[in-house]
Amino acid sequence: MRAEGADHSMINLSVQQVLSLWAHGTVLRNLTEMWYWIFLWALFSSLFVHGAAGVLMFVMLQRHRQGRVLSIIAVSIGFLASVTGAMITSAAVAGIYRVAGKNMAPLEALVWGVGQTVLTLIISFSRILATL
């Protein structure tokens, strides 16, 4: 999928290109393109983490009468909350880059997107340990 930018340049919005990092040598100049690349990395890294946690919960609670349903609900709510936060923080990072007049390399988008998921994990575990 391609979108037309305000300066009549083409913005690449291909999920396959973002996830495979095909865009070596190119830079992300547009706010939409920066946001999209950062958000997709945050989305798929969060999906991986929540998928692994969901499988673990499902296996550990398979004999529990309501455990399977509770694990699906918990993973769904956690995933939706992290994706909502990723939308906002990805837009903030892209906006800061755009206002500063900087371009973003595709690898920087990877670092920002996966970094959001790692930071979410660290904050989540620190909150759980504080309640024990």
Swiss-Prot record:
Family as reported in the entry's similarity comment: Belongs to the TMEM170 family.
Entry keywords, A to Z: Cell membrane, Glycoprotein, Membrane, Transmembrane, Transmembrane helix
Organism of this sequence: Rattus norvegicus (Rat)
Protein name (database record): Transmembrane protein 170B
Residue spans, topological domain Extracellular: 1-37, 90-104
Highest taxon of source: Eukaryota
TM helices/strands, residue ranges: 38-58, 69-89, 105-125
Keyword Cell membrane carried by entry: yes
The keyword Glycoprotein belongs to this UniProt entry's keyword annotation: yes
InterPro entries: Transmembrane_pr_170
Entry membrane topology: Multi-pass membrane protein
